[in-house]
């Protein structure tokens, strides 16, 4: 596959699609974090099943799988559920290492850029674009997002004021992205595309995910425009629609993978303990279960649900608060 001006070797798609069909992505169309994963699936040439979930609570067909976690997206492989794109993309890399999204020479810088993009860059973009596109948002979306952050639901005037406050914070950072590409490079960190390209792309994609109203904010940046075209060319792989009930059935009829061996830190609860985990920023719904893996990068809980039986839910270590039940 040719991406931009450099060749990136992708696997032979016709030989791999059938084998990858156990990947199930729970997502919705205008989720920017879901777009990050969809592009990762495309970059790696994978086939996957698409389960569309509501953008707001309740999510009755998702929470039996995750135990309460309701952020988007969630990757399901049999009876294993992977939460948070930081972990999802790494799990795709572990299962399908070629072509890599983590070139060793670029990995440390890529992680640093991804953290900036998905925190300091994305938050003001979200507030700016949401406040300026109020007429195009699903009913109840802003109230739902406020609940996820423990805030009272905002009225339209409050949202518009937030948009105006955050517009300068967005404009202050866009030149940084343009400058990363100003030397003519194709990708942000080095000669190869990597996870940093996905992490910076999806907040900028959010400008026009619903409407073209704010497309003018990106217009002054030709390097960004060309780079976004290269990332967009990854595509989304090949998806097949799946009913939510079928995804529940898959989990119910599949044994989860045995957890990888791990040695928890002394401060962690011991393996086998009943624990609680939740995100440390927003969407802090608690998931409870038995701790079966506590590694440097990943926390894994085993839990039982009357609808799906035994499932295993995976979280990244960073960004999550793990405690004894």
Q: What is the role of each PLM region?
A:
Residues 237-271:
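Mixed-charge, Lys/Arg-rich low-complexity intrinsically disordered regions
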Residues 117-233:
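GST-like fold's C-terminal all-alpha helical module
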């Amino acid at each position: 596959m040719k991406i931009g001006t450099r060749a990136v070797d992708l696997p032979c798609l016709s030989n791999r699609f059938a084998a990858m069909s156990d990947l199930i992505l729970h997502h919705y169309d205008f989720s920017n974090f879901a777009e990050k994963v969809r592009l990762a699936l495309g970059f790696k040439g994978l086939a996957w099943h698409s389960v569309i979930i509501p953008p707001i609570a309740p999510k009755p067909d998702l929470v039996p799988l995750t135990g309460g976690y309701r952020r988007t997206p969630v990757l399901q492989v049999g009876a294993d559920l992977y939460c948070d794109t930081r972990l999802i993309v790494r799990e795709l890399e572990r299962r399908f290492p070629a072509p890599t999204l983590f070139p060793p020479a670029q990995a440390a810088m890529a992680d640093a850029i991804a953290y900036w993009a998905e925190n300091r860059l994305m938050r003001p973009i979200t507030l700016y674009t949401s406040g300026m596109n109020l007429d195009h948002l699903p009913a109840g979306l802003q109230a739902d997002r406020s609940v996820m952050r423990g805030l009272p639901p905002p009225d339209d005037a409050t949202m518009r004021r937030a948009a105006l406050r955050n517009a300068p914070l967005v404009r202050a950072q866009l030149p940084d992205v343009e400058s990363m590409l100003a030397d003519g490079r194709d990708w942000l960190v080095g000669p190869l595309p990597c996870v940093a390209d996905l992490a910076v792309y999806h907040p900028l994609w959010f400008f026009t995910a619903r409407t073209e109203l704010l497309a003018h904010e990106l217009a002054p940046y030709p390097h960004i425009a060309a780079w976004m075209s290269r990332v967009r060319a990854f595509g989304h792989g090949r998806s097949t629609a799946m009913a939510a009930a079928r995804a529940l059935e898959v989990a119910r009829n599949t044994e989860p993978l045995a957890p990888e061996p791990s040695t928890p830190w002394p401060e962690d609860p011991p393996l086998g303990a009943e624990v609680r985990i939740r995100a440390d920023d927003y969407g802090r719904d608690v998931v409870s279960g038995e701790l079966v893996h506590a590694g440097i990068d990943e926390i894994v809980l085993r839990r039982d649900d009357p609808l799906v039986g035994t499932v295993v839910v995976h979280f990244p270590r960073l960004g999550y608060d793990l405690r004894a039940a």
